[in-house]
Amino acid sequence: MNVRRALADTSVFIGIEATRFDPDRFAGYEWGVSVVTLGELRLGVLQASGPEAAARRLSTYQLAQRFEPLGIDEAVSEAWALLVSKLRAAKLRVPINDSWIAATAVAHGIAILTQDNDYAAMPDVEVITI
């Protein structure tokens, strides 16, 4: 089987947590995870409404930690600046964290695996919507 690399965004982990889909569906992918996604998931643990929600979110955060973390380095920051420049020129606004996740994918030459439409308008970003 040919394995394809992809960067799973925060929505994918939230979808797994909410059991909207089975993670085995993505057996053909080698997942990476942005440090931005890790931060968003950790924030979810810290801001959970109660102990049950916190435990569920912690489990999701720990799942995400099992995948290759992709950090923000000079290549990612360059990709981010170019991406945001193009978006601003087109008068498009996207969530700031999503722009960093997209830049991470672009810098590493991999697609983003997502449930969101936030990446649809982003130039040069390969998106796999689930």
Curated annotation (Swiss-Prot):
All residue ranges annotated as the PINc domain in the record: 7-130
Any single Gene Ontology cellular-component annotation: extracellular region
Cofactor(s) of this protein: Mg(2+)
InterPro entries: PIN-like_dom_sf (IPR029060), PIN_dom (IPR002716), Type_II_TA_system_RNase (IPR050556), VapC_family (IPR022907)
Outcome following mutation: residue 9 to A: Does not inhibit growth, forms complex with VapB4
Protein keywords: Hydrolase, Magnesium, Metal-binding, Nuclease, RNA-binding, Secreted, Toxin-antitoxin system
Highest taxon of source: Bacteria
Binding positions (Mg(2+)): 9, 98
GO molecular function, one term: RNA binding
Keyword set includes Signal: no
Enzyme Commission numbers on file: 3.1.-.-
Record-annotated disulphide pairs: none
One BP term from GO: symbiont-mediated perturbation of host process
Cell compartment(s), UniProt: Secreted
Keyword Metal-binding: yes
Quaternary structure, from the entry: Interacts with cognate antitoxin VapB4.
HAMAP family (UniProt xref): VapC_Nob1
Its biological purpose: Toxic component of a type II toxin-antitoxin (TA) system. Probably exerts its toxic effect by binding to mRNA, inhibiting translation. Binds to, recognizes and cleaves ssRNA at ACGC and AC(A/U)GC sequences, usually between the G and C; cleavage is not very efficient, nor is cleavage required to inhibit protein synthesis. Upon expression in situ, in M.smegmatis or E.coli inhibits cell growth and colony formation; in at least E.coli also causes increased levels of cellular RNA. Its toxic effect is neutralized by coexpression with cognate antitoxin VapB4.
PANTHER family associated with the record: RIBONUCLEASE VAPC2
Family, similarity comment: Belongs to the PINc/VapC protein family.
Protein name, entry field: Ribonuclease VapC4
